[in-house]
Amino acid sequence: MSKKVTNIVEELVTPILADMDLELVDIEYVKEGKNWFLRVFIDSDNGVDIEQCGMVSEKLSEKLDEVDPIPHNYFLEVSSPGAERPLKKPKDFTKAIGKNVYIKTYEPIEGEKEFEGELIGFDGTTVSVTVKDKTRKKTIDIPYEKVASARLAVIFF
């Protein structure tokens, strides 16, 4: 059985990003309407700019043309993950400590499956978030394996 497109793209883009001191955040391969999109989200400690996205796009496009893992036409998009960056890997959670996050879980924890608040800790097995409970704050400890999805959350004042 052939590898998933996202796995192949990850193998192709990782050395490109390493050479540019960038990191891979996520890869999406989706059909929207009649069109297929291959989206590669990149970042660094200093953020990314349009020139870096363009360079990665050019280099990755060359590699994709060589390997040709996608049998039909598609649009390649390389961009920053934006302000509400997904938290996919353990190191993403560690880097997000002290920031506002939005987390969905596979099953209820203390009667809830969605949490928004400040990420105050992550030890590799437990994600600790301070959430607002009516007029006070409380800490919720979420087992890492129960996190279905997580992202940074922007607070508007």
Swiss-Prot record:
Q: Which GO terms describe its biological process?
A: ribosomal small subunit assembly; translation
Q: Which InterPro entries match?
A: Ribosome_maturation_RimP, RimP_C, RimP_C_sf, RimP_N, RimP_N_sf
Where would you say this protein principally sits, based on its record? cytoplasm
One Pfam family linked to the record = RimP_N
Q: Does the keyword Transport apply?
A: no
Q: Write out the annotated subcellular location.
A: Cytoplasm
Q: Which GO terms describe its cellular component?
A: cytosol
The alphabetized UniProt keywords are:
Cytoplasm, Ribosome biogenesis
Matching PANTHER family, A to Z?
RIBOSOME MATURATION FACTOR RIMP
Checking HAMAP family in the record gives:
RimP
The family assignment reads:
Belongs to the RimP family.
Protein purpose: Required for maturation of 30S ribosomal subunits.
Provide the protein name.
Answer: Ribosome maturation factor RimP
